[in-house]
Amino acid sequence: MPFSETDLDRIVTADDLHIAPFRDDGTTYGTPTWIWCVALDGSLYVRGYHGQNSRWYQAAVRQRAGKIVAAGTTTEVTFEPVDGAVNDRIDDAYRTKYAESQYLKPMISDRARSATIRVSPPTTD
């Protein structure tokens, strides 16, 4: 289940997302890490500046769940690694949102692209 359009817009506009995947025990959250985020086709995406060496990325891939804190709200989430052609469109979203930043180039590099994650609220049955 994706974020609502309102929640997604609020998260992306605030640009203050902190990500905290679960630690190896599966119940304790890791230290919240501030990262960039973009929206594409109703989904929220993040990338590891240090690629797959980013600690939060490694935990997100292992645990597949955690929380984000953004726009004054804490949300339980799931994490899904992303690869393939969608990364080109995610690059474009980063270029649009962060065009003036000196950190843009590393965030659209192959290293960062290899650590792209889709962040979603957990599905409810």
Positions of PLM-derived features:
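A generic structural micro-feature
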Residues: 11, 27-29, 60, 109
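Short secondary-structure boundary/capping segments
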Residues: 8-9, 36, 107-109
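Short beta-strand segments
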Residues: 14-49, 78
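Short, P/G- and charge-enriched loop/turn segments at secondary-structure junctions
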Residues: 5-7, 23-24, 104-106
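Extreme N-terminal tail/first-helix region
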Residues: 1-18
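Covalent nucleotidyltransferase core used to form phosphodiester bonds in nucleic acids
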Residues: 7-9, 45-58
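Short, structured beta-strand-loop surface elements
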Residues: 51-122
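Catalytic cores of nucleic-acid ligases and guanylyltransferases
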Residues: 125
